[in-house]
Amino acid sequence: METRAPRWVERDELNRDPAMQDFVQSLIARFGRELSVAVARSSLAPHLFVSRGAHGVFFVNRRPNTVFAFAYAGPDERFAGAAGDLFEYAARGKLVANILEEEPKAKELAGLGYTSTPFGVMQRVPRLAGFSLEGTKMRRLRYQIGHYEKHERCETREYRAGSDPATDRTVAALVDAWKAGKKQIGPYVDHFRGRIASGELPGDCRLFLTYRNGELDNAIVISRLPAANGYLMDLEFYGAEMPLGGLEFAISRILELLAKEGVSCFSLGATFGTQMEACAEEDPRVGKMLRGLHTARIFNNDGNFQFKNKFRPENTRLFVSRSRDAPSASFTDVLMIFADPENRRQSRQEAPASAPATTTPAAPVLPPS
């Protein structure tokens, strides 16, 4: 694809351009990592920024004064140049650009003079063939799996969405039950629930269902990571009555199956709002804000981090990089993209209403995992 100058592509334009879609998919197939393929990406970052020369793309979202790059797909050696294109594009529009990336690329940007503030962690089982429940480090995981297995007839099996309407309805009902226990959910959950209910799961996704005595306890969606010969644990749904160890049982069975298939790695996904200790490269104002929100349990996902750590993954920190002169107040826009990625709150405020719209910021909605 020939694109000499950097280019912003809106979601609607992307949906009407098959050539651009093919170009993006080719980049994901060759270079894409977890945030590029995650189900939440289509909601959190529905637009596209194409770098100069079309060497790479960022999946992006924006607010009136802010650009947020959720994921990059392209060659590693082109990342710094693509990031520079995005920072330059944003500056011309008097916008503040923010780029979410793992530590190696964030350190690269810090070396170029940008700040890189801790925002979370990526957790991976890098060598699936060597994964085992044996050893003292796996004692807690073994205990929880064993606790679940004490219930009779526990099994995890892959299900092809659409192959049985009754099962599709049961899975959709499980998603509804899971939603009922959450204060807030991202819009991508409802979008995905609709696809499950209609039996239209995306081709790169696989669905695994775990039953206990014939009752559905949880559903796990994994998404293919073609560039790594791996899979991402993308979405997990479970009911209130699921006993201790239900998710651990399901994940261990999925890992066992994937290893037999020759899959190389398994990612437990990104966990935002954890492991945000101060570092030399951070924007101290943003770091202080995030740690305050973490202490107040507004932006805190420590429990999810600890859950995934039972599988003894490799953990790589995630950072948000931005210009050193960027106003710290603008970082609230990044948090609001997580809380309201489709900007529905602003739409409600602009629409005529019988009662005044609230302006109280919502707590960030962390992708389910």
Sequence positions of predicted segments:
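Segments forming glycine/polar-rich beta-alpha architectures that bind adenosine-containing cofactors
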Residues: 69-72, 78-83
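Long, low-complexity, intrinsically disordered segments
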Residues: 362-369
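Contiguous alpha-helical scaffold segments within structured protein domains
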Residues: 287-291
